[in-house]
Swiss-Prot record:
Keywords: Acetylation, Cholesterol metabolism, Cytoplasm, HDL, Lipid metabolism, Lipid transport, Nucleus, Phosphoprotein, Repeat, RNA-binding, Steroid metabolism, Sterol metabolism, Transport. Residues 150-212, 222-284, 295-357, 364-424, 435-497, 507-570, 581-643, 653-716, 727-790, 800-863, 873-967, 972-1034, 1052-1117, 1127-1190 form the KH domain. InterPro entries: KH_dom, KH_dom_type_1, KH_dom_type_1_sf. The modification Phosphoserine is found at S11, S31, S317, S645, S1247, S1252. One of its GO terms (molecular function) is RNA binding. This is Vigilin. Residues 1233-1249 have a biased composition (Polar residues).
């Protein structure tokens, strides 16, 4: 590509304006030269000659290709073809195509490759896969496995070659499977089989088989050989630093494995090509034989501790000796006690090697420095700083500190060790001179207090005295604390720690019980009050419990005397709080509350301050009249008197005191104040105030309007008199087990006593503590009579007798079954009488009864009644279809249980029939006769009930009949109700909520027919008693829905209004404000035409709602249109430079003008033909006023603009510019087209004059771009 730039005079001047003044000056001096246009050759230099091109073309492309690495395409595409006979999904009509597509989609999602399928003419399947290389390979494997029919084949190769097919970590096998799109199964190592199974397409199997056989053939060329070589000669074969064996391996391409010195094996293993392996073995054998002949050994003793110096780091010293002298040094294993070192080599070199061994052994030394163990960490320094100074200078010296030992061990080169030892000894001497330590015993329970919160105490001591304090961890339970550092600091720290400890020993902890309700008050707002207490007792720590714990215990800890003082102070505070928490309620008529508060709360504030109480008034919107006063008792009473006096002064409020005995107060108040409240409400809302319970006062105060007070007084005195005459009370005692007998069945006995005497008899409730106490209340004579009767009954009950009766043994079981339930009921009902039946198995009919005489007689009578019931028992069958049984039983059998209790019968339901279909059974012979007669009758009577429908009722005949009627009454009945089909879905309700509600309310089942039936009836099933209610409820619902339908029809009245589309935005208003107002005001929906819908008339506005509302909305719209039609629009020229100022920030200024003059002002958009044209719309008089206003603003703002522009001229003077002449463009001299020579213009079609780049120069084809 080439680009052409045309340099005009304007652009040249613009370029020059950016030059620095110096450049401009030079440009001006040389203007004459610059005026001359450049020559064509200067402006367009010619291309290199042909020869140069040829030379450069002849160069190899290596320069380019060597520098740039090949760029591989990141996305590749491969096409696979699956022949018809190998396709897995051939028949497209049997969901094959769908399954095939589904599989392809799965493969794309899993691999990230893109698949495209197409069918060839031969019905073969072509699959194009695009994506990254690994994704394409995985997708290909999946396609073959899932879309192509699979075949399998086995390849036998030697077992030892299997591991080469698998490769390292199975990588080779995975690669092979991806390449060939097959599944290759290799037998496990413990399986003797040598068969490798390949599964895939025919083509894939062939490829995989070929690859496996290739790997095996490769391994056949390789061989493994083991050579026994004495362990002592291994170093000679390996050579110094394994160089010799490395050279042999490189030259022969054979892998040689020499066992390491630590492994006691002698064989050397060779692996590689047979010929090269033979060469390597021969060379090793030669070295071995040669060394065996020439070498000899000497043994020397070297200290065990010096062996490691002879070996050197990673055995480097041994390799160094071997390299220099050719002698191998054998060191005994570290676990051996031997100190003998053997040197093996040629005799003349052994001397030199021995010298080196001793030099290595003695090159390092071990030394120790005596230093107290407590100084070790000071020698090491913070983060090892002190020690680092020594080790940096002498890196080969190893310094070791042993915990608990008073020495430091140094190890390394002798010279370095000596220097390091001197330095450490100097450090130790210096530390001993200027440091000291002391150990003190403090009970470990105080250690955490010495440390303080987050180590605050101990860190302060450390920093203050420049010492180190070592406190043992809690787990050690040790009392010993060690202080180390400057001698003076150590003594000071010791003194402070002991003082702290002694202070803690004198400390005590005390638990103070304070009700949790006072905790917040004691703490105060933002902890102000508790801060005062802590400032008063700074040495005492006060801990309040967590509010969530609901605990009353406040813990004080500190010096004994201070804790005692703090305890007394807090107890006094709590006593004051308790005293001040007395509370009384004052009922004040609601209309006087504002007078009690006073202007700006002046009255109530004055009462609070003078009485020192807290006064809470009910909220204004509350119905409560009660004012609550809290504080000291005397203060509360004073505040109450003042509030009542205000009320008395304000209105005609009378106050009367009535004397009523204190013992009658509770009975007059009634349960939860119901009785007294009813009198207060009945008498015009008077206030009746009873004295505090336990005060002993008889005075009751009635307060209110005088007429109402008198009425309340009369009622109260009448009620008190009535209570007094009837309030004679006597308490008698009787054992709780007698109570039921005294009450009698269904309360019959006690009712008889009440009716005969007129007294009220109260038995204790289950929760009462005194269960023996029976209270008789009423007039004195009635109470005495009732007492006499009850005491006679109790006396009879206390006379215990023993009696017996005869009961047929066949009835015994009825009394004792269900763990003696019947006997327990008799005992409870008849004063705890004991009934004993003979043991089962004995044929005795004697039953013993023991208890009070009356109880025994009553129990005998009851047992006799039960026996008579049992003897008179009959069984009645009640036929009810089995489908209704569950409904008859009721939830958890509640209905049946009720019937059995009411009629004293037993009811048994049949077992559910598994197969309700009647089957004809063959006749069965019984005692030689055919039982065909009965069966024949049964079969011929289709009306007879099924066995599974019959419910059996047992009991007295009349009770069984009554129970049968009750059961039949429980059989559900179905009725049909006419309900229009279109209302069914509304009756059902959302998710069936409507119908479910009706079913629950009326206890029936409502069945709505399926929608496809379009039936107008709804079936109601349930008890006859509930059906009428349910039907009425359903019909009421139908009426409601029909009324809603009618209302919906009325609401859907539509009205269209024709309005010019230009007025639509005005009717809608800013952010829809105007139209929303109309919608809400008239409760209608207003629809504007869709601008994008060409078929819809654009001037029609649709209003939907009630007819009357739509007409009102239409009138409102037409009124707006009428106003808009009266409006005029005028264009006014307004300088664009002042537009922004008139509009203002975020349009505030222009909005203010539009609101003030009730006009609409539109400014031109950027790029408008006339940027000064502003349109003002509104009523004519408003438009005129608005235009005058904005023109005035323009005049004012333009003056500012002109001043600003004039100032800018002086602030930024124009750059030096030459007078601009008409642009000549870019001019050159001696151009080919301007020459007068007779040369004709070049022929563009000629390859000689316009040669193509590199076309003639191709003696040798060289690829363009990087080498492959």
């Amino acid at each position: 590509m080439s680009s052409v730039a045309v340099l005009t005079q304007e652009s040249f001047a613009e370029h020059r304006s950016g030059l620095v003044p110096q450049q401009i000056k030079v440009a001006t001096l040389n203007s004459e030269e610059e005026n001359d246009p450049p020559t064509y050759k200067d402006a367009f230099p010619p291309l290199p000659e042909k020869a140069a091109c040829l030379e450069s073309a002849q160069e190899p492309a290596g320069a380019w290709s060597n520098k740039i690495r090949p760029i591989k395409a990141s996305v590749i595409t491969q096409v696979f073809h699956v022949p018809l006979e190998e396709r897995k999904y051939k028949d497209m009509n049997q969901f094959g195509e769908g399954e095939q597509a589904k599989i392809c989609l799965e493969i794309m999602q899993r691999t990230g490759a893109h698949l495209e399928l197409s069918l060839a003419k031969d019905q073969g399947l072509s699959i194009m896969v695009s994506g990254k290389l690994d994704a394409v390979m995985k997708a290909r494997k999946d396609i073959v496995a899932r879309l192509q029919t699979q075949a399998s084949a086995t390849v036998p190769i030697p077992k030892e070659h299997h591991r080469f097919v698998i490769g390292k970590n199975g990588e080779k096998l995975q690669d092979l499977e991806l390449k060939t799109a097959t599944k290759i199964q290799i037998p496990r190592p413990d399986d003797p089989s040598n068969q490798i199974k390949i599964t895939g397409t025919k083509e894939g199997i062939e490829k995989a088989r070929h690859e496996v056989l290739l790997i095996s053939a490769e391994q056949d060329k390789r061989a493994v050989e083991r050579l026994e070589v004495e362990k002592a000669f291994h170093p000679f074969i390996a050579g110094p630093y394994n160089r010799l064996v490395g050279e042999i391996m490189q030259e022969t391409g054979t892998r040689i494995n020499i066992p390491p010195p630590s492994v006691n094996r002698t064989e050397i293993v060779f692996t590689g090509e047979k010929e090269q392996l033979a060469q390597a073995v021969a060379r090793i054998k030669k070295i071995y034989e040669e060394k065996k002949k020439k070498t000899t050994t000497i043994a020397v003793e070297v200290k065990k501790s010096q062996h490691k110096y002879v070996i050197g780091p990673k055995g480097n010293s041994l390799q160094e000796i071997l390299e220099r002298t050719g002698v191998s040094v054998e060191i005994p294993p570290s676990d051996s006690i031997s100190e003998t070192v053997i040197l093996r080599g040629e005799p003349e070199k052994l001397g030199q090697a021995l010298t080196e061994v001793y030099a290595k052994a003695n090159s390092f030394t071990v030394s120790s420095v005596s230093a107290p163990s407590w100084l070790h960490r000071f020698i090491i320094g913070k983060k090892g700083q002190n020690l680092a100074k020594i080790t940096q200078q002498m890196p080969k010296v190893h310094i070791e500190f042993t915990e608990g030992e008073d020495k430091i061990t140094l190890e390394g080169p002798t010279e370095d060790v000596n220097v390091a030892q001197e330095q450490i000894e100097g450090m130790v001497k210096d530390l001993i001179n200027r440091m000291d330590y002391v150990e003190i015993n403090i009970d470990h329970k105080f250690h955490r207090h010495l440390i303080g919160k987050s180590g605050a105490n101990i860190n302060r001591i450390k920093d203050q005295y420049k010492v180190s304090v070592r406190i043992p961890p809690d787990s050690e339970k040790s009392n010993l604390i060690r202080i180390e550092g400057d001698p003076q600091g150590v003594q000071q720290a010791k003194r402070e720690l002991l003082e702290l400890a002694s202070r803690m020993e004198n400390e005590r902890t005390k638990d103070l019980i304070i009700e949790q309700r006072f905790h917040r008050t004691i703490i105060g707002q933002k902890g102000e009050r508790i801060r005062e207490i802590r400032d008063k007792f700074p040495e005492v720590i006060i801990n309040f419990p967590d509010p969530a714990q609901k605990s009353d215990i406040v813990q004080l800890r500190g010096p004994k005397n201070e804790v005692e003082k703090c305890t007394k102070y807090m107890q006094k505070m709590v006593a004051d709080l308790v005293e001040n928490s007395y509370s009384i309620s004052v009922p004040i008529f609601k209309q006087f509350h504002k007078n009690i508060i006073g202007k700006g709360g002046a009255n109530i504030k004055k009462i609070r301050e003078e009485s020192n109480t807290k006064i809470d008034l009910p909220a204004e919107n509350s119905n409560s009249e009660t004012i609550i006063i809290t504080g000291k008792r005397a203060n509360c009473e004073a505040a109450r008197s003042r509030i009542l006096s205000i009320q008395k002064d304000l209105a005609n409020i009378a106050e009367v005191e009535v004397s009523i005995p204190a013992k009658l107060h509770n009975s007059l108040i009634g349960t939860k104040g119901r009785l007294i409240r009813s009198i207060m409400e009945e008498c015009g809302g008077v206030h009746i105030h009873f004295p505090v319970e336990g005060s002993g006062s008889d005075t009751v105060v009635i307060r209110g309007p005088s007429s109402d007070v008198e009425k309340a007084k009369k009622q109260l005195l009448h009620l008190a008199e009535e209570k007094q005459t009837k309030s004679f009370t006597v308490d008698i005692r009787a054992k709780p087990e007698y109570h039921k007998f005294l009450i009698g069945k269904g309360g019959g006995k006690i009712r008889k006593v009440r009716d005969s005497t007129g007294a009220r008899i109260i038995f204790p409730a289950a929760e009462d503590k005194d269960q023996d106490l029976i209270t008789i209340i009423g007039k004195e004579d009635a109470v005495r009579e009732a007492q006499k009767e009850l005491e006679a009954l109790i006396q009879n009950l206390e006379n215990v007798v023993e009696d017996y009766m005869l009961v047929d043994p066949k009835h015994h079981r009825h009394f004792v079954i269900r763990r003696g339930q019947v006997l327990r009921e008799i005992a409870e009902e008849y004063g705890g009488v004991m009934v004993s039946f003979p043991r089962s198995g004995t044929q005795s009919d004697k039953v013993t009864l023991k208890g009070a005489k009356d109880c025994v007689e009553a129990a005998k009578k009851r047992i006799q009644e039960i026996i008579e019931d049992l003897e008179a028992q009959v069984t009645v069958e009640c036929a009810i279809p089995q489908k209704f049984h569950r409904s008859v039983m009721g939830p958890k059998g509640s209905r049946i249980q009720q019937i059995t209790r009411d009629y004293n019968v037993q009811i048994k339901f049949p077992d559910r029939e598994e197969n309700p279909v009647h089957s004809v059974e063959p006749s069965i012979q019984e005692n030689g006769d055919e039982a065909g007669e009965g069966r024949e009758a049964k079969e011929t009577d289709p009306g007879s009930p099924r066995r599974c429908d019959i419910i059996i009722i047992s009991g007295r005949k009349e009770k069984c009949e009554a129970a049968k009627e009750a059961l039949e009454a429980l059989v559900p009945v179905t009725i049909e109700v006419e309900v229009p089909f279109d209302l069914h879905r509304y009756i059902i309700g959302q998710k069936g909520s409507g119908i479910r509600k009706m079913m629950d309310e009326f206890e029936v089942n409502i069945h709505v027919p399926a929608p496809e039936l379009q039936s107008d009836t709804i079936a109601i099933t349930g008890l006859a008693a509930n059906l009428d209610r349910a039907k009425a409820g359903l019909l009421d619902r139908v009426k409601e829905l029909q009324a809603e339908q009618e209302d919906r029809a009325l609401r859907s009245f539509k009205l269209s209004v024709t309005v010019d589309p230009k007025y639509h935005p005005k009717i809608i208003g800013r952010k829809g404000a105007v139209i929303t107002q109309i919608r809400l005001e008239h409760e209608v929906n207003i629809q504007f035409p869709d601008k994008d819908d060409g078929n819809q008339p654009q001037d029609q506005i649709t209003i939907t709602g009630y007819e009357k509302n739509t007409e009102a909305a239409r009138d409102a719209i037409l009124k707006i249109v009428g106003e808009l039609e009266q409006m005029v629009s005028e264009d006014v020229p307004l300088d664009h430079r002042v537009h922004a100022r008139i509009i203002g920030a975020r349009g505030k200024a222009i909005r203010k003008i539009m609101d003030e003059f009730k006009v609409d002002i539109r400014f031109p958009q950027s790029g408008a033909p006339d940027p000064n044209c502003v349109t003002v719309t509104g009523l004519p008089e408003n438009v005129e006023e608005a235009i005058d206003h904005i023109l005035n603003l323009e005049e004012e703002y333009l003056a500012d603009v002109v001043d600003s522009e004039a100032l800018q001229v002086y602030m930024k003077p124009p750059a030096h510019e030459e007078s601009r002449a008409p642009s000549k463009g870019f001019v050159v001299r001696d151009a080919p087209w301007t020459s007068n020579s007779s040369e004709k213009a070049p022929d563009m079609s000629s390859s000689e004059e316009f040669p193509s780049f590199g076309a003639q120069v191709a003696p040798k084809t060289l690829p363009w771009g990087p080498k492959r």
